[in-house]
Amino acid sequence: MKHVHFTDVNLEEPSEEGIKDMKVRWLISKKDGAENFAMRLFEIQPGGHSPLHQHDWEHEVFILDGSGVVKGEKRQETYKQGDVFFIPSMEWHQFVNTGTTVTKFLCLIPYKK
């Protein structure tokens, strides 16, 4: 069993191109023995965003704090605290913080595809 406070996990800067003012904490990952899923906590500063990207795995997102939009190829959806998103594999997406406070969200991704 792993038990840790999220602030004890390193806040890292992702290396992907197209990121602005976004960081991530890998709360649960393979290094913890998790073989099926990773749990990540993202933090996006006001005006910041993830890259517009797609990948061959689905993921599930729970918005903890903040507000903004999730942009897709054909539409965009606003988000606020408490919202949940399912993003299927190969769907273009980008999280943009349009609010005045830090956006924080949990994102779960599979290891097995």
Name each model feature, range by range.
Residues 1-36:
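A short, N-terminal "cap"/entry segment at the start of jelly-roll beta-barrel domains
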Residues 51-52, 70-71, 87, 93-100:
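Short beta-strand His + acidic residue motifs that chelate non-heme Fe in jelly-roll/DSBH
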Residues 57-59, 63-68:
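Glycine- and acidic-residue-biased ligand/ion/polar-headgroup-sensing regions
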Residues 25, 40-55, 89:
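Conserved short histidine dyad/triad with adjacent acidic residue
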Residues 41, 86, 101-113:
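A short hydrophobic beta-strand segment most commonly corresponding to one strand
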Residues 48, 56-57, 75, 91-92, ...:
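A generic "binding-loop/recognition-motif" signal
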Residues 74-89:
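Short acidic-glycine-tyrosine-enriched beta hairpin
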